[in-house]
């Protein structure tokens, strides 16, 4: 009898995914009270969409009819070197082409391969674009544990990964979760300049990533002097994590930074033309030029 789980993992590796794990597409019973508490505390800030589709976030069968399995995939984005020509900082995941495009293309190829090799298989691909609790599914699939900074941490390569899923109506052999290896470490909690992190929970409304990307209003004055020059996203809680000493540079060409971005220093004079040149098809497009200029102006104020 064919081992479809093993074959799918092999095909995922051929497409460049670093890790692939499988879990049964069941209701996430343990997560329901946690998600409800997080929302009730308004930790989602002004990300109103986080409160939508509560039932779908917890049950993949409401996203895909007849769902039997969740295939979780990790793709490394850790760069060879940080962009440090300028004092302003951009999260490492945004150095290259927008991950949505890159991973979606790979997932489509994987799904096509599954349908070609196995037959009539229904399902959907997800790349941070629907109400899917990707870190929880990756944890259930044994790809890592959710750390105190709420990121998925993999023992072999840390946490600088994109997470994606295929939810299929195909029954597959599920992998089991691994244990938590954070131990007594509080490096991420201690390092967060806005005090957004408590053990295993992040107050999104205080997170620098939220403030520089998701928040469309003015950044509250209480965060002045606390942004540490981050103008798009933030990597502090990952940079200080001991497990990221195992991070290795990725080999995905699309994630290599724009050559002009490596040396760019004139952030205070950035124009729409320069913005388009530096960030075409980049995740930074999400914040738009005005958002980036707002962030730059805010971090300059002390």
UniProtKB/Swiss-Prot annotation:
The keyword Cytoplasm applies. GO terms for cellular component: cytoplasm. It catalyses: epoxyqueuosine(34) in tRNA + AH2 = queuosine(34) in tRNA + A + H2O. InterPro entries: 4Fe4S_Fe-S-bd, 4Fe4S_Fe_S_CS, QueG, QueG_DUF1730. Binds 2 [4Fe-4S] clusters per monomer. Coiled coil: none annotated. The keyword tRNA processing applies. It is found in: Cytoplasm. Residues 170-202, 221-251 form the 4Fe-4S ferredoxin-type domain. [4Fe-4S] cluster 1 binds at residues 182, 185, 188, 241. Pathway: tRNA modification; tRNA-queuosine biosynthesis. Belongs to the QueG family. Monomer. NCBIfam families: tRNA epoxyqueuosine(34) reductase QueG. This is Epoxyqueuosine reductase. It comes from Leadbetterella byssophila (strain DSM 17132 / JCM 16389 / KACC 11308 / NBRC 106382 / 4M15).
